């Protein structure tokens, strides 16, 4: 039992720790009440003479001081383990009765105020000084000359903010002058972090001033402190590529300063001038901060510059941490070939550079993008062979790699079900191991299960997983919501709905086949897991029983098993609209005729003002596009409405062979760039003939109030109304790109619709002349053109128009690299009809590779 000593030294009383802490607590409470009463009286008297306002920050500061004092006092009492030899031993003290406790407490609490050596404010102040000595050196505290700034920004070490302290020192008189630079820089490097850019500049200026501008004395700790703060910054949104980035420029400036210091030191040594000084050294930590910020900017040029600079000039090669950062950069930039080369370098460079589990997880993520399941299995075997402990994310990534690889029969080598079964077994193994789970691992685990279920076409399990995850997230947000839940439903649903979960659910609808048996139904553990999720999924009620005020509903059909194509189409439409309308809090996709007319009148006036204010067509077009973007953000949940989810949503009627539904979805949710530009041009030319709207009654929105230079016919008015409605509907549309044109061509192949194929051929030809296509990289443009040409060949082959298919191949043989896999179906069809001449021409194109062309491609690859 811990002992504590209370009372005067000449009369020592020993109490158990709990009782002594009780005494201290009561004494503190009494003193605190007395102090508050005294301070209240003083404040009341002082308020009569002058207006003194106590801010909430001051109250919080005083309370923080009091809490700190209480913690310090508790620690002191706890650390008192024994008393002096003249005092009583703990084992010889009899337990104190309740009456004795009450008497002693009364005596202690009745000590006269004049005998108290210190009041509560003095104790708090002494505790504050003791705490502050551990945070900042005494000289810094004196030059800041404001304890409030230090306390408010530094007391909570988990959320310390050094920027106000550095800025206060910057405006002080002495700054860092007359301070020992060595000891000070050691403290500075390990303490001052997460400064904004302007405070970093202030700190750098004060450090240079401290050493009188002698860059030779700018030591390693100073460099590490500055680079560490620079590396933690985030690039601005408008400068993501690192071009002329102020942080990159500052890093290069510091490296130039270091080079200058090395040069000056070498000259002094050669001339034997002054005392020999220690040359600062560049470190791996500095290189890592340079690479960390370069990867944030997605700047390959700057990253290569820093690696080359440190290797050639300073003899510092990238370590494991540096190389891992580089691999993560390659992964984000889709530079998979460079990532694999760097990964192989790490494995064979040395044992110090051997990849850790973080690097392996990054490579597994690349395997998922490449759908390379054999390589992923090899990586997992390497992890086990080298006794590297897998993390939760390792098993999740293995499941996701196998799920994505099973999506294609060619990639999966005809073993799609086996890959999905293996993916589930990795998740079972993860559950059995009970590894540490990060807060994001639950989301990743749900996404992995959704991927396996979606690619398997298991709609029942996908619906259950989607419902359980969204319900859990929604209820968690509502439980922790600080505002009005009923009023803030729009914000809550926007934070709840996730595009990845929606995309996997749409994929499950697209792969619907009532004849297929889910993979999990083939073994006992899978049956138990699937039954567990289905049992928790309530497809009919969907009401939170714990709080009747919070209603959670998803628009699933009130049936547990979807068994028809009509049900799948209906539920997919309902879920899609529910997500786009932000949980049903908006009414964007469905509007009455009256609401449509109101929108037309509203935007007719708005477009009129844009046309009158714009100096030229480009400015008018910019204003309209900005307004469309604004409309979309206000009326649609843009977090879930993207090209990936739309592509999956449009593929549902294609796989279910529902042509009418596909065309409806395509028309309602997409628009084409050339059509948009034609509408904008017509509106601009029409509005430029209308007088300024200032001469018109602002309150009237009828068509009679609009005067034009020439009479408008009914046909003209209908065209204007149609164009305005076209602009209004863009809030729930996405512009067609090369991927969507390819999807439409796949639909034409599936439906054998020649008119649709001709239309998409012409529309894509017009799209190739627009700015979005021309801005694409040339290699990407060629690859996209080749993919579309391949689809056209497939269409003509299925139509039996073999001469047209061969004509496309011959006309593009010098532009595209036609392989046998691209013309396999055409070759088989020609063999069936025994067209030997066409077969010979086709194989000649596929097999013919001129030596000059091969050298040209090799040269381009080397230049890249």
From Swiss-Prot:
- Show me the PPR repeat boundaries: 319-353, 356-390
The record's keywords, sorted A to Z, are: Mitochondrion, mRNA processing, mRNA splicing, Repeat, Transit peptide
Q: Give the organism the record lists.
A: Saccharomyces cerevisiae (strain Lalvin EC1118 / Prise de mousse) (Baker's yeast)
List the PANTHER family hit by this protein, alphabetically.
Answer: PENTATRICOPEPTIDE REPEAT-CONTAINING PROTEIN GUN1, CHLOROPLASTIC, PPR_LONG DOMAIN-CONTAINING PROTEIN
* GO terms under biological process: mitochondria-nucleus signaling pathway; mRNA processing; RNA splicing
Q: Quote the subcellular location field of this record.
A: Mitochondrion
**A GO cellular component entry from the record:** mitochondrion
Give the record's subunit note: Binds to mitochondrial small subunit 15S rRNA.
* General remark: Involved in mitochondrial-nuclear incompatibility, a major determinant in reproductive isolation between species, through hybrid incompatibility of Ccm1 and its interacting partner 15S rRNA between yeast species.
Q: Where is the transit peptide?
A: 1-76
Tell me where on the tree of life, at the top rank, the source sits. Answer: Eukaryota
The name of this protein is Mitochondrial 15S rRNA processing factor CCM1
Role noted for this protein? Regulates mitochondrial small subunit maturation by controlling 15S rRNA 5'-end processing. Localizes to the 5' precursor of the 15S rRNA in a position that is subsequently occupied by mS47 in the mature yeast mtSSU. Uses structure and sequence-specific RNA recognition, binding to a single-stranded region of the precursor and specifically recognizing bases -6 to -1. The exchange of Ccm1 for mS47 is coupled to the irreversible removal of precursor rRNA that is accompanied by conformational changes of the mitoribosomal proteins uS5m and mS26.
Source gene? CCM1
Record family assignment: Belongs to the CCM1 family.
